[in-house]
């Protein structure tokens, strides 16, 4: 291993921000970029009338709705580290793309709206993090408003999300009486002042919880703070780095993203505590990040990131070695060598050509239709990385088009959107209409909008009487053939060529599973692995 690769890997931090919709995730993303010096002023999704859109929300439909639909990737330097920040779709309808992004990160920052507490989407996302024991940092947001009791919020995280909390900062008041936070580990009080343009050096700090200056600053709140801190230190967990890295304990910070307050502490904790890139599982062996040879996997494909270019970009997480522009790398699924000359790195939709990249970095490869989610790349070794799942869709629609002459454009559009993971596409074994599967209604709206804007196709979606899908497999080819013959009306082939059973209701699925005990019904399937 070269010292250069080892040093670069140690400098890397790759994390995603996860939250329930409207918890303030996109605002926090902007502020992290602002504090790191990566951008000069933060746009916010709420300021729709000003035309100032958030850096990380770039697709038309996102600009119209003010939600993050596609996951963006942003790289910036902070305190001699290179940070790769993946902003995930917060809207509940985009959970599948979010799940996949979580396969490409080494840690996650969970944002909770302190007025609402733990919400449904947060629970789902944390369960995906738990599959890989991803370390989690927690930010309780919106303390400039009236919020719930802080101890109650910690209890809720521990009980519902089943992860122990270690408060690192503690709020002093809330809403109009929000005075700041006490940093438990540093024994410092950071004083809050409202205003979205303040930078970290502009917040006052008072050293020591027993400092007499505090009585003068806020005589009413200081005794309550001291009582609460005594209670917190007796009742909650101390921060422990090993337990954090094992995904068992989360450090908790309090603040107000819109007012830039509490951001600095989060950034510092991610640099200091979050792990550098970790080894990754491949089918043949474990791949270490500081190995000399380059390897990586595709976790997302995004069509038409730039309306001027009409292109598709495959997002690759580097797992080992060093990527250099122009190097030859092997696309293992199709056994083809490609010269990587026009690979890009991201600041949301702003792109720059990559000269080099190391484990933990996310790079974009122009894709003309050959690359699929889950594909692995290396300098030649047959490595297929594992752990990139498709999830069984929960909503289904059949597709028709208003102009039958545009059937080819429809098929091309759905093929591309299916590969990208925007929607799952099933071709029934009997019947002509294609079936689309998604995890939320808004996904269908996005597909309608993108078919119209990018492929010139007006599509109509009708409800399909399908309750759920399961991918099916069987080691006994004869039994599988019997199953196919008996259930042809409920079977379809997905975009990856896999056989799926489309169940009209829960009872039907249960009975079918009982009737065919040798057939395996899968709720997830691995990308790039045929069942």
UniProtKB/Swiss-Prot annotation:
Per its UniProt record, what InterPro entries does this chain match?
EF-G-like_DII, EFG_III/V, G_TR_CS, P-loop_NTPase, PrfC, RF3_C, RF3_dom_3_sf, RF3_GTP-bd
Q: Does the keyword GTP-binding apply?
A: yes
| Any one GO molecular function term | translation release factor activity, codon specific
Q: Which domain of life is it from?
A: Bacteria
Compartmental location: Cytoplasm
The residue ranges of the tr-type G domain are: 10-278
What keywords are annotated for this sequence in UniProt?
Cytoplasm, GTP-binding, Nucleotide-binding, Protein biosynthesis
For this record, the Gene Ontology CC terms, alphabetical, are: cytosol
Q: Which residues form a coiled coil?
A: none
Note the Gene3D superfamilies from the entry: P-loop containing nucleotide triphosphate hydrolases, Peptide chain release factor 3, domain III
Q: Which Pfam families match?
A: EF-G_D2, GTP_EFTU, RF3_C
Where along this sequence does the record place binding of GTP? 19-26, 87-91, 141-144
Give the GO terms filed under biological process for this record: regulation of translational termination
- What's this protein's family per the entry? Belongs to the TRAFAC class translation factor GTPase superfamily. Classic translation factor GTPase family. PrfC subfamily.
| NCBIfam families for this protein | prfC, PRK00741.1, small_GTP
Functional summary from the UniProt entry: Increases the formation of ribosomal termination complexes and stimulates activities of RF-1 and RF-2. It binds guanine nucleotides and has strong preference for UGA stop codons. It may interact directly with the ribosome. The stimulation of RF-1 and RF-2 is significantly reduced by GTP and GDP, but not by GMP.
Q: What is this protein called?
A: Peptide chain release factor 3
Q: Which gene encodes it?
A: prfC
């Amino acid at each position: 291993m070269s010292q250069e690769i080892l040093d670069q890997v140690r400098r890397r931090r790759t994390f995603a921000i996860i939250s329930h919709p409207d918890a303030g995730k996109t605002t926090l993303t902007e502020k992290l970029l602002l504090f790191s010096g990566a951008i000069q002023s933060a746009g916010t999704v709420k300021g729709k009338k000003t035309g100032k859109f958030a850096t990380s929300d770039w697709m038309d439909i996102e600009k119209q709705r003010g939600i993050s639909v596609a996951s963006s990737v942003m790289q910036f330097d902070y305190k001699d580290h290179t940070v790769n920040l993946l902003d995930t779709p917060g809207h509940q309808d985009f959970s599948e793309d979010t799940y996949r992004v979580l396969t490409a990160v080494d840690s996650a920052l969970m944002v909770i709206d302190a007025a609402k507490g733990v919400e449904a989407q947060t629970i789902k996302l944390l369960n995906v993090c738990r599959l890989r024991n991803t370390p989690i940092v927690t930010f309780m947001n919106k303390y400039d408003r009236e919020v719930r009791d802080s101890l109650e919020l910690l209890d809720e995280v521990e009980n519902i999300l089943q992860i122990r909390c270690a408060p690192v900062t503690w709020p002093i008041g809330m809403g109009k009486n929000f005075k700041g936070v006490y940093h438990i580990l540093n024994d410092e009080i950071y004083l809050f002042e409202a205003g979205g343009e303040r930078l970290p050096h502009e917040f006052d700090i008072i050293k020591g919880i027993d400092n007499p200056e505090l009585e003068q600053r806020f005589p009413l709140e200081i005794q309550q703070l001291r009582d609460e801190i005594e209670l917190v230190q007796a009742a909650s967990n101390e921060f422990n780095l090993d337990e954090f890295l094992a995904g068992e304990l989360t450090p908790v910070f309090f603040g107000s993203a819109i007012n830039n307050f509490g951001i600095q502490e989060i950034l510092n904790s991610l640099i200091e505590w979050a792990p550098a890139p970790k080894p990754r599982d491949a089918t043949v062996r474990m791949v270490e990040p500081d190995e000399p040879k380059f390897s990586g996997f595709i976790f997302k494909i995004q069509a038409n990131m730039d309306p001027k270019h009409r292109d598709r970009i495959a997002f690759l997480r580097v797992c080992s070695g060093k990527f250099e522009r122009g190097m030859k790398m092997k696309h293992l699924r199709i056994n083809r060598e490609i010269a990587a000359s026009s690979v890009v790195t991201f600041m949301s939709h702003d792109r720059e050509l990559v000269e080099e990249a190391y484990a933990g970095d996310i790079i974009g490869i122009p894709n003309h239709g050959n690359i699929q989610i889950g594909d692995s790349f290396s300098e030649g070794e047959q490595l297929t990385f594992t752990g990139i799942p498709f999830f069984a869709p929960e909503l289904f629609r059949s597709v028709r088009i208003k102009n039958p002459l545009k059937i080819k454009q429809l098929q091309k559009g759905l093929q591309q959107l299916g590969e990208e993971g925007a929607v799952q596409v099933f071709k029934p074994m009997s019947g002509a209409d294609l079936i689309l599967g998604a995890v939320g209604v808004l996904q269908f709206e996005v597909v309608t909008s993108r078919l119209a804007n990018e492929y010139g196709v007006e599509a109509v979606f009708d409800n399909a009487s399908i309750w759920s899908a399961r991918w099916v497999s069987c080691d006994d080819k004869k039994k599988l053939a019997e199953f196919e013959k008996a259930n042809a009306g409920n079977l379809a082939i997905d975009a990856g060529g896999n056989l799926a059973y489309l169940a009209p209701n829960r009872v039907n699925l249960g009975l079918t599973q009982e009737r065919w005990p040798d057939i395996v019904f899968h709720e997830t399937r691995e990308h790039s692995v045929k069942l």
